[in-house]
Amino acid sequence: MIKKYLFLFFIFLIFNFVLSIQPPLSEYNCLKNFVTKFKLSTKFPTNSTGGYDFCSIVSCNPVNGSINGFLSLQSESTTPTTVTVVGTDLSCLPFNNLNLQNFLISTTLLYTKFFTSCSTLAINSDSITSITQVLAPYETFTIVSKKLNGALKMSNFINQKSILITNSNSTSGYTLVNDALAENKIKLETPNFSGLLSVPDLTGYTSLGYPAFYFSDALEVTSLALANIKTIGAVSSRLYFPSTKTIQFPTSYHNDTSYLTIQGKFTKPTAVIDLSKFVNCRNIQILNYDKTFNINGEIPIKTSPFTDIYYTDGNITKIPIGGTSFVTWSTEQSITIKKSGLSGTLPPLSGVIPTYYDFSGNSISGTLSNTWCNTNIIVTDNLMTGTLPSCIVCHLNNSEVAKKFTGNKFTNLVTSNPPCTTFAPKIKVDKSQKTIILTGTDFGTYTSGWILNTTLSCEKLWTKVTYGSNYTCTYPSTTTLDKVSYFWINFNTPGRNYTFPAISQVPTPNSIIVGTSNSVTISGTFFSTYIGYVTQSISVGSISCTVGTSSFSSITCTLDSAPSTNTEQKLIITTNSLIKEAYISTVVGFNNNKLCPNDCTSSTRGICYMNNGTCKCNSGYVGLDCSGLQCKVPNCSNGGTCNTTVGLCVCDSSHQSLDCSLDFKQCPKGLNSLICSGGGNSCNNQTGICTCNSSHQGLNCSINYKQCPIGSNSLICSGGGNSCNNQTGICKCDSSHQGSDCANDFIQCPLKNSIPCSGHGICNNKTGDCTCDSGFTNQDCSGYTCTSNNCNGHGVCDTSKGICQCYPEWQDIDCQTPFKNCLDPTCSNNGICKNTTGICECNSSHQGLTCSIDFNQCPIGSNSLICSGGSGNICNNQTGICTCDSSHQGPDCGTDFIKCPTQNLTPCNGFGNCNNITGSCSCDQNHQSEDCNIVYKECPIINSLICNGFDNSCNNQTGVCTCDDLHQGLDCGLEYKPCINNCNGNGVCNNQTSICTCYEAYQGETCQFQINQCPNNCTTGGDCDTITGICNCYPLRINNDCSGYECLDPNCGDHGICNDMNGLCICDKGYRGDNCIYVDHYASSVIPTKEEGGTVLIYGLFGEINNDPNVQVGNSNCLISNITSNSIECIIGKGSGIKDISVTQNGFEWIGKSMFNYIKSKQSCPNNCNSNGICNDLQGKCECYPGFTGHDCNSLSKTDLISPSTPKVNENTANGIIENGENKFEIMVITLQEKTFTNGVLKQYNLENNWKLLEIINDENNNIFKFKQNLTDSSEISINLEIIKKDRIINFADYSFEISKDSIKVSINISNYIYSNSLNYLQLHLKSNAYKTNKTSSDDEFDCNLDDGSDAKIDNQDLENSNINHENFVTIIKDNKILNGRYIDHVISDGISTFISSRTIEKDSNSITVGLNLPHCKNCLIDPDFSVLLSTDFKENCSDSNSNNYIIPVSITVSIGGAAVLVGSAIFFYRKKFIENTLKIQLKRLSKNNSSGSDGGNTQS
């Protein structure tokens, strides 16, 4: 309770703090003058003191009260006024967004940019009747007027990225003229034109994003120019035609259009509208004003399979599932049909169909079957009943799911803890594809609610494979899933968390407890994901344990009976095919949680005793973790040792065999030093004797051996005179034998021409006989054989030729065929005589023994018989004609002959033709009946149907239609539709259309409602529901009269507010983009690379969204290798010099002018050291010869001539003072300016004489004075002045510098400065004064170093050229003494060294002011310093007088801290350095003080 009151009290304090804020005085007076001028007393009442509490009414900065955000002002005058808003009325306010309502507007306000910090201007004023000039360069410009008419030139909108022009008078309008030059058409992105009279031609506008076009009621359909729609090349095109005009639905669009919205009253199409060629269109929205845009109750368009369809307020009677009569939809489409009269029951799904349907606001009835589970179905506000399927019920605790089904009468639509017993996701990990696959039952489609643990993460959202049943998640390649055993997924709906295995692993228990009542509790991993997909069984000993609950990490089960407690019992857990065994103690309450080493390696090697953590190894395995293999003979027969790694004996040198039980003796080695000469020879290590292979012989098998063949008499080479060579293995036979084994006798065959068997046969030397080749004969194979050796006994074979000579009665090559002659050997020249039979073979057109008679085939009937067979049908095959009997007809006699009805002996009564095939009459057009004796009259035909079809009937004797109850007319072609309730007496019924024509004051289908007008007639932004008097706004239109425009993201990314005048987001400071999702990026520091090229580091603010990032250095691209929210790393090629740097992302460019400076490999020295030193080109610094000093060695180093200096700090002014002799030098921080990118001064803070001393520190080492002053309520500037007590080295921005004793070091801190605009930058001014004190020296009149009255010599080239050795010098030579002002060209920006610039601002006869251009950073440190040295022209002796030299060292460090808030802008120009032309500075000589004074003293002026 106390916390509650404290919280309320805190809110009270905040509320009062907000109410107490007031704008700065100048802004307060500015707004007060406007309120007074226009008498805005209602919105801005005075308070009790007579003043105004502006910040309680308008948007003020919560810190300093500045009106630098959104300002909306509305006239309160109800009568015409002549008081006009002019630019100077409000140019004194720093708002960035201005909205003016109902004022009389000066035209100069339209064409001149008075409000420099403003990027968005909206004006609603009927005083604007035309736009005749180029509008002022506000990026977003809105003009609303009821009197804006005529032709508006697009060339007047070239300065706008977003333009909204509205004529809110529905009886008039305007047109657009495309007259802008091509280069001026690029900037416009979001045009919004309302009140158009025709479709504009936007040819050449290539940057369009989301244009919208609202057409006036006054348009003429004939001049609408619908063809111009194809010139609108935009991401999304929106066209809203008035409800008062009927137009043709446009059919031609630009190919680049991805999203199309079109609203209107469209004529009823007569054919399907084919838009399928516009394949780039991803979504088309059709918003109807009436019910005519359909074909037979279906959507009348055909789209590509990638186009989503949104159709509303039409008349669609058929519930489309897989498509329409004109097109089949694909799974890639989404279908939305709202408030269009869909009715009937929702059918179950089948086939390939879209996965998204929105049927909201229709009249669909029936139940929702589970076939819809794999779709995203929305049926809000229908008439459905019954129960929702489980796939939906499981996720009703998600309001996004539940609202899809509200407005029906589902009995189980429970949103709080809905019952869910079927939820069962299933996971598979595919490591090869680095993919997690999710399948299962009723796990839903709300993928953003599926959260993986930190072990894994999806690179993107879950990817749909099959909607509602199969999804995949690709995890990053950096994730080593091999090292991950399992992971969990939290399913937001229905609110369950499950752990899934990443690998296949046996159950792994780590704790097992047997409890009372025979209960068993097991903890560990890899048991089960959940019920449904894993079969488990558990037993302890021989007792089964019935599973009660099971999860990935635990199991509870109940034993069927009490287990034995005498000894450990074996626990067996079986999960599918994976088995885990362990021995446990079954003593009640004992925790078996002792894990064995390496889990006993595997279940096949050993089992863990979890009561004591020891392994029981299975047979064949040994070791603490059973990882070793036991040898078959454990002691290896005392002839060796067992190697348990491989389970084999390692024998000693005198034993062998697997168990080392056999002795070992070495066999002799061959000439090749191999035992038994190697090869296939073997050694008997028990006897030491070689056994040679079949190819070797000898004691060591070194001699080759080849066995000769053995003959049939079992003798080598068959014995006898034959011999064997067992080196080669070849027999040598004697002259009477042959063969490889010399076993065969040798006998010569008959010879011809000394050739055995005449060369035509094979000689058998065993018998001496020839075997002749085919075709040869005789003993020596010299003769030829006939085909038949004896010519079949009907002839004689001539072996010299191999040909049969046949006897006269026979023929053929082998004389086997008798020879017979025909009766007419010529066969009448109509055939061929066959001598084998003596019969003529006639051709197809003749017949007879001699082929002299013609032959013609008669037709064959369908029964495959000639003349169809039958006894009465006869074929004449000389003529080929059938003669049919009396009951048949036709060429093949295959058709029956039937007589027709006859009247007066005349078939068909003479009024028709007889078909003797069917026996029926075909009456002429004027007769009917079987015999054509009845007259026929035709009834009227419509729609190609007699009497229009349906249940209408025709009397063909009279030709008159009889209509059913639903039709009327001579041809029944008119529908008969009675009106409901006869129009309630408030109108006239048309019973052809069943439509009531209501009297003037009534409306509705049955004239049942009175007409109620809507506010402002819905301002052309919506349709008036005249029943309720409430506007139904068009998409993206809002407010009760639809006068407002809804932003694409109404929440503006939670970083802005939506301006309903133009539908554009007004982003908070620090954000930008159409939806305010991008940060206003900038760079605060750059670490460059050498001229050879390399890695560049850029630090700043870049946000989490980095779309299409690009870095340019000068004209070179810097290839990005890494980008984070606050840094960019990129690689660039070689270059040189100072370059602009630009960072582009999310479509916006930021530019840092002269922010990048290539690092030189060799540095040049200033003035080449004036020949008084050597240039160190690595550092760009002079190493002066003895006697010289200074940055360019142009000064003398004699310090014995120098009078000591006296440093001081003025505690009232915070000025640093150094006095030396009669000269006094002051160092002051005088001004801080906020400047625009065009160098204009927006704000200036005069710092002089406003410092407050905070603290003085004075000890042995330090003497520091601390000051500060407030810049605004939220920002301040502080300064520390330190008097240096001893020489020391200062390290700054990676460089080292020496600062001398008696110097003054100045540190400046600017914190929490809030910029008016991100285009702006800060410039800090430091001023140095040189004076003569009132004291003079008697030596002065003799000092030859005093000037002669001429001007001082000034050299500021280094300051204007920052590309030399990181040091910029301003050199002032006076009295032969040199004042060196050193400005380092680097700054420590948020802890990082980066390049900056400094420049001369102003000079006069005794002072110089230097400006430091500060980077955009939270903390910046800048370190200039000053010193006075001797010129080389300095004279040590002037006659009789001594000269004096003055050295004034000053060091200044500046820091900027805190948060600087940026205002959104299209392009950032960050002012890092301003390089001016060489400034010729001439300081007038210091006036010589001739007044007398005490010698040697210094006084403070």
Curated annotation (Swiss-Prot):
Cellular component terms (Gene Ontology): membrane
Disruption phenotype: Cells are unable to sporulate when in pure population although they will sporulate when in chimerae with wild-type cells. Cells form loose aggregate before disaggregating. Cells aggregate and disaggregate in waves. comC-/lagC-/tgrD1-mutant fails to form spores.
Chief location bin: membrane
Residues annotated as transmembrane: 1447-1467
Range of residues in the leader sequence: 1-20
The entry's keywords: Developmental protein, Disulfide bond, EGF-like domain, Glycoprotein, Membrane, Repeat, Signal, Transmembrane, Transmembrane helix
Induction info: Down-regulated by Pseudomonas aeruginosa, PAO1 strain and up-regulated by PA14 strain infection.
Pfam families: Beta-sand_ComC_1st, Beta-sand_ComC_2nd, ComC_SSD, EGF_2, EGF_TEN, LRR_ComC, TIG
Glycosylation site residues: 47, 64, 169, 192, 255, 315, 397, 453, 470, 497, 612, 635, 643, 685, 693, 700, 726, 765, 835, 843, 877, 916, 956, 991, 1017, 1122, 1270, 1309, 1334, 1437
EGF-like domain mapped to chain residues: 627-661, 782-816, 818-852, 896-933, 975-1008, 1043-1077, 1161-1194
Topological domains, Extracellular: 21-1446
Domain of life, source organism: Eukaryota
The keyword Signal belongs to this UniProt entry's keyword annotation: yes
SMART domains from the UniProt entry: EGF
Cysteine disulfide partners in this protein: 631-642, 636-649, 651-660, 786-797, 791-804, 806-815, 822-833, 827-840, 842-851, 900-914, 908-921, 923-932, 979-989, 983-996, 998-1007, 1047-1058, 1052-1065, 1067-1076, 1165-1175, 1169-1182, 1184-1193
Cytoplasmic side: 1468-1501
Topology relative to the membrane: Single-pass type I membrane protein
UniProt subcellular location: Membrane
InterPro entries the record matches: B-sand_ComC_1st (IPR057014), B-sand_ComC_2nd (IPR057015), ComC_SSD (IPR054484), EGF-like_comC (IPR053331), EGF-like_dom (IPR000742), EGF_extracell (IPR013111), IPT_dom (IPR002909), LRR_ComC (IPR057013)
Function: Regulates aggregation via a pathway that involves lagC and tgrD1/lagD. Inhibits lagC and activates lagD expression.
Record-given protein name: EGF-like domain-containing protein comC
Species of origin: Dictyostelium discoideum
